Structure formats: structure tokens, C-alpha cells
Amino acid sequence: MVLASVTCTAPVNIAVIKYWGKRDENIILPLNSSLSGTLHQDDLKTTTTIVASEDYTEDELYLNGKKEDINAVRYQNVLKMIRSRATKLMDKKHCVHIASINNFPTAAGLASSASGYCCLVFTLAQMYGVDGDISGIARLGSGSACRSMYGGFVKWEMGTKDDGSDSIAVQVQPESHWPDMNIIVLVVNDKKKETSSTDGMQKSAATSVMMKERCAVTVPNRMRDIEEAINKKDFQTFGDITMKDSDDFHEVCATTTPPIYYLNDTSRYIMNLIHRYNKLSGSIKCAYTFDAGPNACIYLPAESTTEVLSLFMKHFPGDDMQTYYRGPKENIPSIENFVPSEKLASLYTPDTTFVNSLKYILHTKVGPGPQILSESESLIDNTTGLPKQLN
């Protein structure tokens, strides 16, 4: 007999102040605080259904239709913590089946672990009636997952306590505060990265000469300044800090022993193009940030989007705009027909070396945190206990 069924969604977030390095690997406590923007779930999200039933004999987990090992340490840490704080379904004998899907390809290199663990924890919390902060539980699955617990702009406070109780996410401003903040993601064609984020963090923390000053001085100052910029909707300061922190993060990786390089030639071409565009424009009109991979995430105000998208389309043209440009389709005519100003004309002569360097261009905006869906949107067949896509 089914005792409860809950379906929720959770967003991806893109950090502008990077999290890199842990002071505790087991409960995922970071060496520095970080800050991110939450991307809108109309474009990127994880959906998770959890069903509790007297008929289930064990907990089961399915990701994108494939059964996963739910006994993995991070899943178990999350389940144990949620169940220890339960106010509903207190009988521990009841097992759950979990089905989770992403509406974006994992191969895109976007942070699916953040939305995935956030969605898992948020959905479990609804089912078990967990009160209070749950971002610290999401952190046990994936550090950056705690920042997906809220919409808008979110900081993950590193905390100082050994038990991690003060290492939680806090909303800086909701998505309604800066509604014209847009994000463009340039998804780069690239092979699987050679060094995972987990391994990279450990090596950088142990060997990079930049880590000490970054954690003690650079990041605390930037956290203060970028939070103030967000509060004031000061894009010049926001953009400047965002690009500098991305550059510093990749310099930390480059000064790691052995050096780690997540960016490729396409990434560097994009960085140079954005700096040239901002210089000719006379102000910062868009700002790049790169995580541990070659994809460019670009923050920009709504007023700059058509101009910037037309520039990217010129340098990285797609065969079919309907599939290549993953954003509001009504924007396509204005992007295709955009005529640059005379002072920007020199930018519209692309290096043909990079013409086929992108898989696609995603255009979204800052959006809300996790959402609860109706029973009709469940991913699990209550009769079989399996994901509907497997029936």
C-alpha cells in the first residue's frame, strides 16, 4: 500500500564566487564561502518523485531511468539525516522508491549533481515532514547542491564549526530583486575532462600556492563586494568580480601540481571576445564565468542580450536556429537581423577555426528555488513501483 508520494523540481545554479577545496571531505565543508545565481527551471531542472510503500522491501533509486546504487555513501548520508529529523512516516521499516530525471543532457557539462541532490533532499523533506534548514543536508550529497535550495542569488557560508551546522546556504536576494538578469550558456564541444572536480579540489588544496591567500583574503573580500553589488543591482561591479574570480579559480588550477587545465582554446577565445566587446562598448555589458570545464556561463542584463547573442551567433553559427538556440524562440528574428553599431563592427569578423566549437547556446534567466508538483506529474507507477519510463 502506498503511504505517500511526492514530486518536486529543483534548479541548477552557476557560481560567480567559486567553491574549490574542502576542509572536511566526509561532510563536505568548504575552504571558502561561495555565491551563485539560480537558473530558471523553465530551461534547466531536475524532477524527482519519491514514493513510500508498505509493499517495498528495500530503498531503490533510478536516475534517468537507470537503477543506481542507493547504498553509496552520499545517498545514505542524506537518507539517514532526513529520517533522523522526520516528523512524518516515523516507522523506519517503510522503504522508498526514488525516480529522478534531468531535462538537460548530462553530457552538457552543467552541474547536474547540484540540482539532483537538492531535488532529492527537498522531496524527501516534504515526504518526511522535516522542519528547519535542509540546505546543510543537501550539502552532504554535493556541496553546491545547498545553493540550489533557494532562488535568485544564494551564498553558501563556509561556517567554522566542526559539525558543519553553520555551513549552510542563505538567500542573498530572491529572483524578483533583479528580474532582468539573464544567463547565456555556451555549451562547448569537448571530450570528458581528465581531472574530476573532487580530485582537482584535493590536489589544489594540497599544492597550489594561491589557495591560502584566496581562502583567507581574496574570497572574503569578493563575497562582501559582490553581495553589495547584487543588493544595489550594480552590474559593473558584479561583472568585474565575476570574471576576476573565474580567472583566479583557473589560475589556482594551473598552479596545482601537476597543473590542471579545464579550459580549452574555445573557452579562451570566448573570454577574449567578451573582453574585446566590453572594451569597445565602454563598459562591462556581459561577464563570463567558467566552472571546472570548458563551458562559458555568461551573466548579462536583458538590454544586452540581443546584441551579445548576435555576436555569439556570428562567431559560432549553428545549422538550425530552432535547435541550436535554446531560448525564447520569439527572440530568433531579432538576433538574426541585428545590425551592430559602427564601433562594434570590427568584432563581427570571426576566426573560422572555432565555427563548429559549440553544441548549442542556452539562454535563460535567474529563477526560483525548488517547487512542489501535483500527483499527476509523478515519475513512478504506483502499481509497479518502477519509473513510468521503464513500464
From Swiss-Prot:
InterPro entries: GHMP_kinase_C_sf, Mev_decarb, Mev_diP_decarb, MVD-like_N, Mvd1_C, Ribosomal_Su5_D2-typ_SF, Ribsml_uS5_D2-typ_fold_subgr
GO BP terms, alphabetized: cholesterol biosynthetic process; isopentenyl diphosphate biosynthetic process, mevalonate pathway
Pathway connected to this protein: Steroid biosynthesis; cholesterol biosynthesis
Keyword NADP in annotation: no
One Pfam family recorded for the sequence: MDD_C
Keywords noted in UniProt: ATP-binding, Cholesterol biosynthesis, Cholesterol metabolism, Cytoplasm, Lipid biosynthesis, Lipid metabolism, Lyase, Nucleotide-binding, Steroid biosynthesis, Steroid metabolism, Sterol biosynthesis, Sterol metabolism
Broad class of where this protein is predominantly found: cytoplasm
Reaction it catalyzes: (R)-5-diphosphomevalonate + ATP = isopentenyl diphosphate + ADP + phosphate + CO2
Listed EC numbers: 4.1.1.33
Cellular component terms (Gene Ontology): cytosol
Subcellular location: Cytoplasm
Chain positions recorded as (R)-5-diphosphomevalonate binding sites: Y19, W20, G21, K22, R74, S142, G143, S144, A145, C146, R147, T198
GO MF entry, a single one: diphosphomevalonate decarboxylase activity
Family per record: Belongs to the diphosphomevalonate decarboxylase family.
Role, per record: Catalyzes the ATP dependent decarboxylation of (R)-5-diphosphomevalonate to form isopentenyl diphosphate (IPP). Functions in the mevalonate (MVA) pathway leading to isopentenyl diphosphate (IPP), a key precursor for the biosynthesis of isoprenoids and sterol synthesis.
Matches recorded under NCBIfam families: mevDPdecarb
Subunit structure, as described in the record: Homodimer.
Protein name per its UniProtKB record: Diphosphomevalonate decarboxylase
Gene: mvd
